[in-house]
Amino acid sequence: MPKVGMPEIRKPQLVKATMSVIDRVGLHAASISLISKEAGVSTGIINHYFGGKHGLLEETMREILRQLSATIKENLSQLPADAHHQRINAIIDGNFVGFQAENQVAKTWLAFWSYSMHDAQLKRLQRVNERRLLSHLKKELKALLDQDQAELVAHGIASLIDGIWLRGTLNPQGIDAEKARVIINDYLDKQLTFYSKLK
């Protein structure tokens, strides 16, 4: 967490610079020196407020997660509470549109995933994000399926989101949001049809 007193105007500047440098040289080569030059600040500012590269990466991921959460909440707020299928699509869309679909953000996500396997704090952030996604999905799916089925389908959708994200970051053309929507909706429709036949 950044120390209290960090000028709010500087945080977005540093987050953007961090993503830009990760995009250009990768996480391991993204030094405080390169990030500070990109942001136009001294290395001392980053070290003082964030405690170094790790703290800045953590704040960058927190910002990406905040924006993801805000996008999904905004999408859901525009839909009726009983429009469950549409609300599931709104959750899915939140992961593939706007800020989240930018190439720099996608590459930062990928770096974050790989780093979080060996870092307790980043792993905790990753788990918070995973639980939040599953919670949103299960809430809507439980209105359409029983609890066990909703759990399985929620995990299936989350796995597809992660897989499409991973493939998108490795693709020079980036993430194809429309194709992602089609693939995930095809899975969802097939699951809903399958379970409806069991009733």
Swiss-Prot record:
Gene3D superfamilies: Tetracycline Repressor, domain 2. SUPFAM superfamilies: Homeodomain-like, Tetracyclin repressor-like, C-terminal domain. InterPro entries: BetI_C (IPR039538), DNA-bd_HTH_TetR-type_CS (IPR023772), Homeodomain-like_sf (IPR009057), HTH-type_TetR-like_transc_reg (IPR050109), HTH_TetR (IPR001647), Tet_transcr_reg_TetR-rel_C_sf (IPR036271), Tscrpt_rep_BetI (IPR017757). GO terms for molecular function: DNA-binding transcription factor activity; transcription cis-regulatory region binding. The keyword Transcription regulation applies. Residues 31-50 bind DNA. GO terms for biological process: glycine betaine biosynthetic process from choline; negative regulation of DNA-templated transcription. Keywords: DNA-binding, Repressor, Transcription, Transcription regulation. Pathway: Amine and polyamine biosynthesis; betaine biosynthesis via choline pathway [regulation]. It comes from the Bacteria. Signal peptide: none annotated. Residues 8-68 form the HTH tetR-type domain. Coiled coil: none annotated. Repressor involved in the biosynthesis of the osmoprotectant glycine betaine. It represses transcription of the choline transporter BetT and the genes of BetAB involved in the synthesis of glycine betaine. This is HTH-type transcriptional regulator BetI.
